[in-house]
């Protein structure tokens, strides 16, 4: 989606970072919920490290997983606050910011932080 300005401003984030985040979070989900199906021996150095974490810290991994999603919810809600502060009042743009930030966290939120709306002169 292209970027608009003012009340309907939205900018999609970097495809590179979104891919890195999606692959990482997918792997994390796999580790937490289906660790018995992971081919540890085929993952190079990541395999034994992941196996060690699963064997010794699975509860911590699971709690960290849910904490990560909770943080993403908080970031998404903060994105809505930032939208209002920056004059982004279009409900579709706000929804896009909320969803993008929920899925990709600070990779999305940093774009919204950097946005500087043009202020109109008041005479």
Swiss-Prot record:
Q: Which domain of life is it from?
A: Eukaryota
Q: Which InterPro entries match?
A: TMEM254
| Cross-referenced Pfam families | TMEM254
Q: Where in the cell is it found?
A: Membrane
Q: Which UniProt keywords apply?
A: Membrane, Transmembrane, Transmembrane helix
What topology in the membrane does the UniProt record assign? Multi-pass membrane protein
What is the name attached to this protein's record? Transmembrane protein 254
């Amino acid at each position: 989606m292209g970027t608009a300005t003012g009340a309907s401003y939205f900018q999609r984030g970097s495809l590179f970072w979104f891919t890195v985040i999606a692959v990482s979070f997918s792997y994390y989900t796999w580790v937490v919920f289906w660790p018995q199906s992971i081919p540890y021996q085929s993952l190079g150095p990541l395999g034994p490290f992941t196996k060690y974490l699963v064997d010794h810290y699975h509860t911590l991994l699971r709690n960290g997983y849910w904490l990560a999603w909770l943080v993403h919810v908080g970031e998404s809600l903060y994105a809505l606050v930032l939208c209002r502060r920056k004059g982004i009042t279009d409900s579709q743009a706000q929804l896009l910011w909320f969803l993008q930030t929920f899925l990709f966290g600070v990779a999305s939120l940093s774009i919204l932080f950097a946005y500087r709306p043009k202020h109109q002169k008041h005479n």
